[in-house]
């Protein structure tokens, strides 16, 4: 992994690379958190997004979505991934799971979970 100590970060995460880089200083602490930490943080971020939407603050809601992406990236960090592996996983998942299958995915969530 490229860190501040051994060189500049790469750009494998495109526009999300700055989110990854911003959290690099807390890498060790993040990797030591229990999985339940991330679940709770996601719940908090969704609550905050809903509050922004309830007060017609779309920009605030958009920032909370960016925070959700940040949490997802830190989950990938927690799982031991670096930006290059995340980029490859995302490309692979999009191609092999999502492309031409999004309607079926939505149907699955509706039929199995009622959402």
Task: Enumerate the predicted regions with their spans.
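Flexible "arm" and connector segments at domain edges
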Residues: 1-65, 69-115
